[in-house]
Structures are given as structure tokens and as C-alpha cells.
Amino acid sequence: MDGAASVCYTDGSIALGGKTVLKSTPGFWQAMDQLLAHSKIAIDRPRGSQHPRYPKMVYPLDYGYLEGTSAMDGEGVDVWVGTSPVNGLDALLCVVDLPKGEVEVKLLLGGTEGETQLALQFQSQPPLMLALLVRRKETPSKKDSTESGSSQ
């Protein structure tokens, strides 16, 4: 389907070549917000630090996990944290790590467009590790921030 046009619908679904390829369940993003609201973020790999097993890989953003949660690898749910003053959930990265035989979902919080791309590049190390970026249509906290900012 190279060259096929993609369409994003108001319900958040995405179609490619006329076929729906991505659609979220109603309430999905709100459930993610609830998980975040009840979890503390622990940063164990600050921006600029080296990966413990691959020293040439340097973390472009703060990277950590949500305390009290569990991901597919048995560890806490992974998070990338950007520098935006509004720290809402912007997107997800679905990562396939072929050498480990793992698939994980990583949360992107408060990232600028450039920071989102940095996290995507870090997680995409073809051909062994590949990532899919799933953007949130609108981050509620950013919408609220914009609305409150306009009334001042």
C-alpha cells in the first residue's frame, strides 16, 4: 500500500487505502489518564545518560517508569518525559524488540514534536528494534491549559 492516502477520522480511527488500520476503544485514553493520575513517575535514566548495556546509546529525554504498574516485561510501565510544562499523555510508542522477543508500550508525556521524534528514533533501531508512534488526538491537560491561558 505504498503511496496510499491515509485518513484520520473524528473518532480517532485511521484508515489507509480505505481500510481502518487503527481505532481506539471508547474510554481508552481516559483509562490511560487514570493510570497516570494514580502512579508516580520514577526517572531511572535521566536525559543524557547512557544505556546500561549499550553505552553508545544516550537517552535524549528523561526515561523511567510508573511505580506500582506492570508492563509485559514484568517491570513498571515505561515512560518518556519531555520538557513541556503541561505534562499530559501525548502519545504511545509500541516497540517490537526482536532479540528479546518482546513487545512493549511506552508512554510519551509532555513532549514537544521534536522530543517525540527523538524518542521514536531512540526506540527504532532497525532491523532488530522497531517502533510505531500512536498519537493522541488531543491531550486534555494541554486543552485545559490553552483555555485557562486565554481567559487571563
PLM region descriptions:
Residues V7, G12-G149:
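Hydrophobic N-terminal alpha-helices or hydrophobic patches in metabolic proteins across all domains
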